[in-house]
Amino acid sequence: MTTLSCKVTSVEAITDTVYRVRLVPDAAFSFRAGQYLMVVMDERDKRPFSMASTPDEKGFIELHIGASELNLYAMAVMDRILKDREIVVDIPHGDAWLRDDEERPLILIAGGTGFSYVRSILLTALARNPARDVTIYWGGREEKHLYDLSELEALSVNHPNLRIEPVVEQPEEGWRGRTGTVLTAVLQDYGTLAGHDIYIAGRFEMAKIARDLFCHERNAREDRLFGDAFAFI
């Protein structure tokens, strides 16, 4: 574990509640795709955020932070970032990193800013094996919550093996993607998940339901199901 002081080089408000933050650490760092860091608020208060950048991007760390009056836990971190333009982080954390088996097809599942977790995995997996079959299911309450959908669609142009499945719970008129939940979409698309590696970013309750459904109804291998939540449930 490494403790780093990081300068905040940019803060972009992607939506009214999501911020893209870039940090430049004061020393060398390393991590695996899918790991997270802890923002050190004080000695006893450390707050986890997935790294959206990849291990190959050595000069900076990118975070996607969902912060609003409904999420004061993250809002306090954003307040410090905006005020001090510098934060201290512990890096790396988490065991739900991208495994080295480059042949098994991937299913990446995220809700909201959980996309930061699967983004690092997606970009790293395609860099290692550009022909690997990858499907990403990204869910949000509204279309605006899928804030980097255009980046994904551009990536799929150069990777025909990459399938993007955006899922919205409350679609507006003209929405062309899926409606409902990401877990329902996965179950609709696959009769079996036995041959897939599955990475999930979401709340504990969502991860538990996914594990139960995928393993019991679609024969997913529990040892090929990855997500930070599984360390706690």
From Swiss-Prot:
State its Enzyme Commission number(s): 1.5.1.41
Keywords, A to Z? Answer: FAD, Flavoprotein, FMN, Ion transport, Iron, Iron transport, NAD, NADP, Oxidoreductase, Transport
Signal peptide as annotated in the record: none
**Cross-referenced PROSITE patterns:** FAD_FR (PS51384)
InterPro entries linked: Cbr1-like_FAD-bd_dom, FAD-bd_FR_type, FNR_nucleotide-bd, OxRdtase_FAD/NAD-bd, Riboflavin_synthase-like_b-brl
Q: Which GO terms describe its biological process?
A: iron ion transport
Against Pfam families, the record matches this protein to: FAD_binding_6, NAD_binding_1
Q: Name one GO molecular function term.
A: riboflavin reductase (NADPH) activity
Binding-site residues for pyridine, renumbered to this chain:
G111, G112, T113, G114, F115
Catalyzes what? reduced riboflavin + NADP(+) = riboflavin + NADPH + 2 H(+); reduced riboflavin + NAD(+) = riboflavin + NADH + 2 H(+)
Q: Which SUPFAM superfamilies match?
A: Ferredoxin reductase-like, C-terminal NADP-linked domain (SSF52343), Riboflavin synthase domain-like (SSF63380)
Give residue ranges for domain FAD-binding FR-type. 2-119
> So what family is this one in?
Belongs to the Fre/LuxG FAD/NAD(P) flavoprotein oxidoreductase family.
Q: Any idea what job this protein has?
A: Catalyzes the reduction of soluble flavins by reduced pyridine nucleotides.
Q: How does it assemble?
A: Monomer.
Q: What is this protein called?
A: NAD(P)H-flavin reductase
